[in-house]
Design a protein with these regions (language model features):
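Extended hydrophobic/aromatic segments used for targeting, binding, or gating
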Residues: 43-44, 53
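A short acidic-Thr-Gly-centered motif at the start of a beta-strand
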Residues: 10-13, 50-62
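A short alpha-helix-loop-beta-strand transition element characteristic
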Residues: 7-19
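Signature of the catalytic double-stranded beta-helix
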Residues: 1-7
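Short beta-strand-initiation
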Residues: 15-18, 53, 169
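Non-catalytic peripheral regions of patatin-like phospholipases
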Residues: 1, 23-41, 62-63, 69-232
Length: 232
């Protein structure tokens, strides 16, 4: 099916970079399949979405892989580490599991709620960590500029102030809000009705975000890192 729907030759031509993550079942380590470094094939895409227990592990070059969401469901850090230092970034970060929810009332709803927390918590953690890191780097550069000349040659001072200025990063955080009829099987329930509902919800959230006045004014803020959650 993927070969009918996806033009892998176009992906591997390099005009648009594609990176997908999967976790090695035997080592527990995250692996990145990056079109800038690897020829992307259908099995790479299948591995990146092989979330157990609904989907079996996928074998690639003798190793077995599951969905990378088991380690990092929104791998923002990989994008930031791989981008060019001077480039400003506009990131649309899609979170299919909401960190916010109600207290479970049964074993079944507990299963669904713990999936929400498990797969969404790293998203907010990574975003918050990135903002703190940007502020720390900027403070280090400002402090270095105030040092007297005899201290600017200190190796520790040069290390703190090294590198280019961090790029300006704008993140649109699109969070899926669960419907009332979903249950604990939502991570592997792919009926036609569910897919149509999910596609429609995604379109509404994107349109609502792009039309929001805060998004239109995003370039006027003084922060190097701006996170917008405007789809609620």
């Amino acid at each position: 099916t993927l070969h009918k729907l996806v033009d892998f030759d176009r992906i591997n031509q390099g005009a648009t970079r594609l990176s997908v993550g999967a976790v090695n079942v035997e080592t527990g380590n995250m692996t990145w399949f990056d079109s800038d470094k690897t020829e992307i094939r259908a099995d790479h895409i299948m591995a990146s979405g092989a979330l157990p227990p609904g989907f079996p592990a996928v074998e690639i070059d003798g190793a077995w892989f599951w969905d990378g969401g088991l380690v990092s469901n929104t791998p923002l850090q990989y994008v930031l580490d791989e981008q060019m230092p001077a480039d400003d970034l506009c990131v649309f970060q899609v979170d299919l599991f909401s960190a916010r929810g109600t207290v479970p009332s049964s074993v079944w709803t507990s299963e669904g709620r713990q999936k929400d927390i498990r797969f969404s918590s790293r998203t907010r953690f990574n975003t918050d960590m990135m903002r703190r890191l940007h502020k720390t780097r900027e403070a280090a550069r400002r402090l270095y500029a105030k040092l007297p000349p005899e201290l600017k040659d200190d190796p520790d001072a040069r290390a703190l102030a090294s590198g280019n200025a961090d790029p300006r990063v704008t993140i649109a955080h699109l969070i899926y809000r669960q419907t009332r009829f979903e249950n604990q099987n939502k991570d592997f329930e792919f009926s036609r009705r569910s897919m149509l509902d999910h596609w429609a919800a995604g379109r509404r959230d994107v349109e609502r975000t792009l039309a929001h006045p805060d998004w239109a004014a995003r370039h006027h803020t003084g922060e190097r890192v701006n996170v917008f959650d405007l789809s609620a």
